Each structure stands twice: as C-alpha cells, then as structure tokens.
Amino acid sequence: MKLENLKSKEGSRHKTKRVGRGFGSGIGKTSTRGSKGQKSRKSGHTRPGFEGGQTTLYRRIPKIGFNNKNFANNYNVVTLNNIVKLNLANVDKKVLVEKGLIEDNKLPIKVIGTATISKPISVSAHKFSKGSVATLEKSKSKFVVIK
C-alpha cells in the first residue's frame, strides 16, 4: 500500500459549495442569502444575545456576587507525604524547586497533609497546615516558618 493509492471512503467527502459564481451554477446572484434584508448583507448577522435593539437579557439582570481572585493569597502547595518521599534531612525552597515539587518560584510555599515520618526532618516553608504541624511535632521534626 502506498500513500498515492489511498482513497477516502465513499460519501465521506463532499464538494465545497462555491456560491456567487454565475447563474449557471444555480447558486449565483444572491448566493443562497435571499433577496433583501439584514441577513443578506455582507455584515448582516447580529452578535449573540442581540434582541433587536431591546435591552438584552444579560444587561437587564442585576450584577451579583464578588470575586477576590486579584487579591487572593496563592501558594505553592506541597504535601508532607511528597516531602517524606524525598528522603532528605533538610528540605527548603531550593530543594523543592530542584526536585520539581513546586512550579512557581515566586509564590510562597505551604505544606499540607499528614504522613508517617520515620526519622526527624527539617522543613522550611512560609505556611504549615494544622495537620502537618501536628505530624512534624509528633515525629520530633523541625519546621521553620519563613517570613
């Protein structure tokens, strides 16, 4: 089988409709648009939601809610389980970037979750969840809060 011998399945391909190419084609002159009116003009279609000049539904309904995403505190979230899997004594921002556990180097780091820790480790991050603090204290590990 060669590339030039391939044929598409019967009925799967249609010829493109070439409109406005003379009377003999059957779709010349008005090009299937009808004779007059807004939709027959070149830019005759209205935007989505247009109601003929009447105030549209999305503008009649009052605005509700509030979005605080511009002022939200975003963190690089790292699970304590992933930190334990690294099997290192000291874990800080530099190590987390090298190992690929955090993507954005500019954002602060938050450690969450619980894990079984066999030997004490030292973790430095900007924030810790209550569960992660309890787990680290239980295993006599050190956690440093970065300012």
UniProtKB/Swiss-Prot annotation:
Residues 1-54 are annotated as: Disordered. InterPro entries: Ribosomal_uL15, Ribosomal_uL15/eL18, Ribosomal_uL15/eL18_sf, Ribosomal_uL15_bac-type. One of its GO terms (cellular component) is cytosolic large ribosomal subunit. It comes from the Bacteria. Gene3D superfamilies: 3.100.10.10. Keywords: Ribonucleoprotein, Ribosomal protein, RNA-binding, rRNA-binding. Pfam families: Ribosomal_L27A (PF00828). One of its GO terms (molecular function) is structural constituent of ribosome. Residues 36-45 have a biased composition (Basic residues). The keyword Magnesium does not apply. GO terms for biological process: translation. The keyword RNA-binding applies. Residues 1-13 have a biased composition (Basic and acidic residues). Binds to the 23S rRNA. HAMAP family: Ribosomal_uL15. Part of the 50S ribosomal subunit. PANTHER family: 50S RIBOSOMAL PROTEIN L15 (PTHR12934), LARGE RIBOSOMAL SUBUNIT PROTEIN UL15M (PTHR12934:SF11). Belongs to the universal ribosomal protein uL15 family. This is Large ribosomal subunit protein uL15. It comes from Malacoplasma penetrans (strain HF-2) (Mycoplasma penetrans).
